[in-house]
Amino acid sequence: MDASAGGGGNSLPTAGADGAKRRVCYFYDAEVGNYYYGQGHPMKPHRIRMTHALLAHYGLLDQMQVLKPHPARDRDLCRFHADDYVAFLRSVTPETQQDQIRALKRFNVGEDCPVFDGLYSFCQTYAGGSVGGAVKLNHGHDIAINWAGGLHHAKKCEASGFCYVNDIVLAILELLKYHQRVLYVDIDIHHGDGVEEAFYTTDRVMTVSFHKFGDYFPGTGDIRDIGHSKGKYYSLNVPLDDGIDDESYQSLFKPIMGKVMEVFRPGAVVLQCGADSLSGDRLGCFNLSIRGHAECVRFMRSFNVPLLLLGGGGYTIRNVARCWCYETGVALGHELTDKMPPNEYFEYFGPDYTLHVAPSNMENKNTRQQLDDIRSRLLDNLSKLRHAPSVQFQERPPEAELPEQDEDQEDPDERHHADSDVEMDDVKPLDDSGRRSSIQNVRVKRESAETDAADQDGNRVAAENTKGTEPAADGVGSSKQTVPTDASAMAIDEPGSLKVEPDNSNKLQDQPSVHQKT
């Protein structure tokens, strides 16, 4: 179908590769909007249903392959997460949690990350979408989208910051089966600590996070945190202050990411599009417009490298839906009209009923000198990467057995949770104090960009940090052996048919080890 068809407007103007049409797939499960963190909690999965409704009424669903993700299984999650943590998530319920107080404390499940009905199914759903998106990119799609994913704070053995399972790490591990190097970019207002930590000692994954830094959750992401051992200079942190606007943000994003693409040369890119960096977010303090936020998507799309777009934070949910709808249009090369089409959530977008909202007049505390210093320092770090790492091709491990089914016939309101969309944006939010309370306990591993004195014992430290987490052939941080593909594995591109992986295919060796900060 032509990109200009449907109710959305005109195609984006062609500007090099950015104007070209892309093969896009989109993962959505109608059940995801039913999950409910609880009364007063700012995280509302219902925003995914609102986004989907806008995509439908803008005519975008007809322009991409719409897929229902297959739920990730225990063994899929255990490619990164600890077995006992996954077992706990599977077993705990609101009725049984009082009998598991020690486990709740051990795995950091509680106020920020509550136990709610269907918790494990929720984790399986959003993780399955992200891993499924990675599989689609490995098989020729240009862009894969999972707005339910992007939960970047989850650690190997604990929940954090509203996140239970780190779908991003799992998706990157899947991409590493086909690509020598994978780039992770995070534009959520909060530092992407869980992903950075997982790949802190490898040169096969570069992580770049643009975030609010200071007395703000999770308290990590200092510009001096650059990676360790083989991963030195492969972690980039861009610390920002309150009120940053589109112009200031792009004055950093484009030169830094342009240089990253030049020196790292990734085979695939994962972009976490947390919408809490938008102006007016309930938990945020930035001043980005939707167009400014989406400019990051547009810029990364222009490199014509396989791109996985994920969600993340975002707590003024009417603006989250606006943002991710518009960014889906950008992914498709399709400029959407500002006047919003009638839809089942139309009343929530008043009084203007437009796709875009104006940023506020809040003060931009990021001075020109500060921005120039950050840009100069990070570009200098990138100049120390003389060449992109290479990896020898050997036998490839079996890919994730995550069949999807077409979503066209799904009823998006089936089994609708009565409370999931009652509390929209007007409920007084939980303040950031609970999340901030953990900042004082965070011990960040830092390595100065100017000092190489610690390099001599780098291998020893890395070995100690990764002891017991060396990957099996099919993943990082798992003690399990590779699971052979069997006749029950479903084909990705043709739901319902059978697919068996050949035994003599190629594999990327040297899967990165998981780095656990202590």
Curated annotation (Swiss-Prot):
Q: Which cofactor does it need?
A: Zn(2+)
Q: Where is this region: Disordered?
A: 387-518
In the Enzyme Commission scheme, what number(s) does this protein have? 3.5.1.98
Q: What class of enzyme is it?
A: hydrolase
Cellular compartments per GO CC:
nucleus
Q: Where is this site: Polarizes the scissile carbonyl of the substrate?
A: 315
Question: Its GO biological process terms?
Answer: epigenetic regulation of gene expression
Biased region (Acidic residues) positions are: 401-412
Chain residues that bind Zn(2+): 188, 190, 276
Q: What segments bear the compositional bias annotation Basic and acidic residues?
A: 413-435
Alphabetic keyword roster: Chromatin regulator, Hydrolase, Metal-binding, Nucleus, Repressor, Transcription, Transcription regulation, Zinc
Q: What is the protein's given name? A: Histone deacetylase 1
Q: What is the lineage of its organism?
A: Eukaryota, Viridiplantae, Streptophyta, Embryophyta, Tracheophyta
